[in-house]
């Protein structure tokens, strides 16, 4: 959809502040701005560690229509899989729930092209000023750290009104 305002979220699936945003603020932001066509929301991987990279890879291997839902599940269950003795096995279970078969999961985890693509995305974001997660790029301006729906509204309402 051609929403007038774009938000890019730079996130790591192992970042607790990112999980707080997705668990506490994202649904309100989506209802108020994305579902109404005012804002386009783009996910940009910025993995902070190897487990975060693997989680990002798994999410990217799922059918793209299921991607936003998988991201939400990963954040809602972050404490379970990210701190598990075997996080990859936990990611595999989540992938299976999203329709990613065992072979598809294994080839996904072994895809150097996918890993390199995600790391290149992170490097590009870093070069453009992103230093931590979550960071939000709203119409070219960077906003590091999680924010409340009220804080997002203060930023977004004038931009939406302008367009």
Predicted segments, located by residue:
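Structural alpha/beta surface segment adjacent to cysteine/selenocysteine redox centers
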Residues: 11-13, 19-96
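C-terminal cap of thioredoxin/glutaredoxin-like
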Residues: 12, 93-163
